[in-house]
Swiss-Prot record:
Annotated positions of the Phosphoserine modification: S12, S24, S27, S44, S47, S322
Subcellular localization(s) per the UniProt record: Nucleus
Pfam families: LRR_4 (PF12799), LRR_9 (PF14580)
Coiled-coil residue spans: none
Region annotated Disordered, chain positions: 1-65
Swiss-Prot/TrEMBL keywords: Acetylation, Leucine-rich repeat, Nucleus, Phosphoprotein, Repeat
Physiological role: Regulatory subunit of protein phosphatase 1. Inactivates the PPP1CC isoform 2 during epididymal sperm maturation.
Domain LRRCT: from-to ranges: 331-360
Homology family: Belongs to the SDS22 family.
Modified residues (N-acetylalanine): A2
Tissue-level expression: Expressed in epididymal spermatozoa including the principal piece of the flagellum and the head-neck junction.
GO CC terms in record: nucleus
Name the UniProt record assigns to this protein: Protein phosphatase 1 regulatory subunit 7
């Protein structure tokens, strides 16, 4: 069922996923950039990729007619059931699937989550791209580890507090305005909430096993309430309303940080994030590379579409011996006819400048 859409998803500089599915409202060349680097983050194959095409349109206005479930043959002994794009309008008749572990119902016409109580062995449930307005009737699925209800019409996070074995939760591109009702999900490792209407990071302090958090393309104004997430390795906050890098001091295991398309003016607040290998601060209002000389494990540094105009700032990156990819295009620096040559001289380990590989 392609449960791993994640971290690397298209939440790139667009986003998101990731990620793995994560997320893509930016320009096409930005997407290409992510793919070239092999770090299609944050936003997930689900994040943002179809968002602009679909927008907030109510799928009920579509012209597809639901299919009769009696015309669909189900294998009683199947462990993996994929009914992607079958025009299913109602969940029914699945009680015969006593052994099913993964059930994919993406891209159908489902309006209500129902009639799944008998699927006690279910580990993964995919309801991506339907017409669901409410999370309900899932309490009996206590073995569930992966739940995807992205690209639906949800306004609230609810009805999942009993799913205590859940490890991955994807609710991308809905109409959710608040993070809530997930405090019991102690085993959660990946949370994907890109492309919603969330205004604050809150109610996640009990998610101490969380490794990846995708919140790209929301309305968040401040990095906060992250102190308990000491196992977090990926944080994606592209396309929000941030003006300051802060609140990351406890994220000592953070390896990938995506902050593009915000209103940040200064690089700061990264003193304890020594393990960072990926830093994306593209499309902000930053004039200077500073406070990153201690990030010696950096492999990728994306700072295109900012206000950088001083070549000596690149000295801040010289300690990153493994730095292979830098994006500095569409900064004032790029006007220099020796732009690429000067980057190569300042950062000899770099193998890719913007979207082009270095030729030796």
């Amino acid at each position: 069922m392609a449960a791993e859409r994640g971290a690397g998803q298209q939440q790139s500089q667009e986003m998101m996923e990731v990620d793995r599915r994560v997320e893509s409202e930016e320009s096409g060349d930005e997407e290409g950039k992510k793919q070239n680097s092999g770090m299609v983050a944050d936003l997930s194959a689900h994040s943002l990729k179809d968002g602009e095409e679909r927008g907030d349109e109510d799928p009920e206005e579509g012209q597809e007619l639901p299919v009769d479930m009696e015309t669909i043959s189900l294998d009683r002994d199947a462990e993996d059931v994929d009914l992607n794009h079958y025009r299913i309008g109602k969940i029914e008749g699945f009680e015969v699937l006593k052994k099913v572990k993964t059930l994919c119902l993406r891209q159908n016409l489902i309006k209500c989550i129902e009639n799944l109580e008998g699927l006690q062995s279910l580990r993964e449930l995919d309801l991506y791209d339907n017409q669901i307005r409410r999370i309900e009737n899932l309490d009996a699925l206590t073995e569930l580890e992966v739940l995807d209800i992205s690209f639906n019409l949800l306004r609230n996070i609810e009805g999942i507090d009993k799913l205590t074995r859940l490890k991955k939760l994807f609710l991308v591109n809905n109409k959710i305005n608040k993070i809530e009702n997930i405090s019991s999900l102690h085993q959660l490792q990946m949370l994907e909430l890109g492309s919603n209407r969330i205004r604050a990071i809150e109610n996640i302090d009990t998610l101490t096993n969380l490794e990846s958090l995708f919140l790209g393309k929301n309305k968040i104004t401040k990095l906060q309430n992250l102190d308990a997430l000491t196992n977090l390795t990926v944080l994606s906050m592209q396309s929000n309303r941030l003006t300051k890098i802060e609140g990351l001091q406890s994220l000592v295991n953070l390896r990938e940080l995506y902050l593009s398309h915000n209103g940040i003016e200064v690089i700061e607040g990264l003193d304890n994030n020594n393990k960072l290998t990926m830093l994306d601060i593209a499309s902000n209002r930053i004039k200077k590379i500073e406070n990153v000389s201690h990030l010696t494990e950096l492999q990728e540094f994306w700072m295109n579409d900012n206000l950088l105009d001083c070549w000596s700032d690149l000295d801040e990156l010289k300690g990153a011996r493994s730095l292979e990819t830098v994006y500095l295009e569409r900064n004032p620096l790029q006007r220099d006819p020796q732009y690429r040559r000067k980057i190569m001289l300042a950062l000899p380990s770099v193998r890719q400048i913007d979207a082009t590989f270095v030729r030796f």
